[in-house]
Amino acid sequence: MGRVAAGICGARGLGHRPAGDGGAAGGKPYFPACPQVHFSVSHTRTAALVAVSAAPVGADVEQVRPLYPAMARRLAQADCGDLQPFELWTLRESWFKLTGAGDLRTIPFRRADGVLVPPEAGALCRVYGDIPGCVAAVCSLAEQPPERLQFVPPREICT
């Protein structure tokens, strides 16, 4: 996935390769020549998601599929409003990638009156359903995630 991140960042003019030697907090990959650029990478069988930001960011994408009962129980949360299981899953994963904190089984997200309520005041999170067959989420503590995802053609990534 580092190649995907490098390809997308190169296509966007950043031209830097990420390093995965643990120099960033929690061993997270980073761009040594451009430390002010933050990114988060996720993939599933059918999609890859790379979030690039001027502030720390967490992103996750999951392919929607039937849930085993044990997984459904793991995702259960008493007060999550109308969040669907994969929305909750991707939000929790993206939050964990952003902060490195919390228990993936219990990170508290909910939707109240149509508004996403993240686990920490001031956090900015968004759920995306525009990747066919997938759900994605992005979380930040400083920048509002974009309203829509920007799709990058594979030929721009793999050249």
Residue ranges with predicted function:
Residues 1-159:
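Core catalytic alpha/beta fold that binds nucleotide/phospho-ligands
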